[in-house]
A protein has these predicted regions:
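Asp-based, Mg2+/Mn2+-dependent phosphohydrolase catalytic module
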Residues: 40-43, 57-158
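Hydrophobic beta-strand core positions in alpha/beta domains
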Residues: 50-51, 128
Length: 158
């Protein structure tokens, strides 16, 4: 954004912060209707779960707070913590370590080319969540789904 606006990263960050204050996002309207059902299912089966977002931690926490999703996740990781971000696998490898799970035993659900690539580079099973509004590359995904509930069948294949 800084490069696009031809300003310093600090000024771009200040613009971004002010924009989010002036125009807050209602994340409950963006939450997929089937998301809570899948999270409940996975939690009931005892799977450790995490959020590994390349976004800012404060924004990620805001999303989780608004949608009342904190209770499902054991770990919340932000890309701000790392030198490299997606598509670099560091964020996913760190998250697996925090969960005490081997990367090859992890399933990543992603909705972006960068995230899919990061999961692939981390050696994880990658589920690409297709969205007709966005055309992104799913070629590195292990599976491609249109609905999160499809993941229920996939976890038994892994």
């Amino acid at each position: 954004i800084a490069k696009f606006l031809n300003v310093s990263p600090e000024i771009a960050a200040a613009y971004h912060t002010q924009f989010n204050i002036d125009f807050p996002t209602d994340f409950t309207k963006l939450l997929r209707p089937e998301a809570v059902e899948l999270l409940e299912y996975l939690k009931d089966l005892g799977y450790p779960m995490a959020v590994a977002s390349s976004g800012r931690l404060i924004r990620t926490m805001n999303k989780l707070d608004q949608c009342d999703l904190h209770k499902y996740f054991d770990v919340v990781i932000s890309g701000e913590q790392f030198k490299e971000t997606k598509p670099h696998p560091e964020i996913f490898l760190h998250t697996a370590k925090q969960l005490n799970v081997d990367p090859e035993d992890c399933m990543v659900i992603e909705d972006s080319t960068m995230g899919i690539t990061a999961g692939y580079n981390a050696g994880m099973c990658v589920v690409a969540l297709r969205d007709p509004r966005f055309n992104f590359d799913t070629s590195l995904a292990t599976y491609v789904v249109d609905n999160l509930l499809e993941v229920k069948q996939l976890i038994h294949k892994k």
